[in-house]
Amino acid sequence: DRKLLARYLGVDESLLGGPAAAPVAGDLISVPRLAVEASAGPGALASREETISRFGFDARWLRGVASAPQNVSAIAVRGESMLPTLSEGDEILVDRGDAADRLRDGIYVLRVEEALLVKRIALNPAGLGGRRLSIRSDNPAYPDWEECDPATVEIIGRVIWVGRRMA
């Protein structure tokens, strides 16, 4: 019996040729989509951070990838400095609970002066001048910022997911 086999294997019955299970709304966590864009380019000014819509994510999945679901919000990407990893119009989930105090190599949303950016951060070994970081663009047409003082950068949160429209 397909249903029994699916239960035994811990998979959805649809993977074994059966009908797709209807999604259960109680298993979703609502994540706010903010009226903010993170620039993958010269920098976007974040003037308002109001919720304009919401996305629903599987509760178990979100708890597994985020520091805590309430720390997560979605924002849009603007610009091309992070191509091919991030494209203009992509939606990214930002975990604000995974920021400066847990900093490690990865893609982060950060604020430099008034500009909100999405960039790759690489930690440099602590030398005589203390801990430094490099802020990098994945697109080689854009410059990297090497040996930055972490005190000059506000780390907003780590990017934990990207969604994009398939043209």
Indicate residue ranges for each PLM-predicted region.
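Short, basic-rich loop-to-helix N-cap that marks the start of a DNA-contacting helix
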Residues: D1-R7
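Short, positionally conserved secondary-structure boundary motifs
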Residues: R7-G10, S14-E88, G97-D101, G127-L128, ...
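A generic structural signal for residues embedded in beta-strands
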Residues: V94-D95, L110
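Short coil-to-beta-strand transition motifs
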Residues: R111-L117, V153-E154
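Glycine- and charge-enriched low-complexity intrinsically disordered segments
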Residues: A122-A167
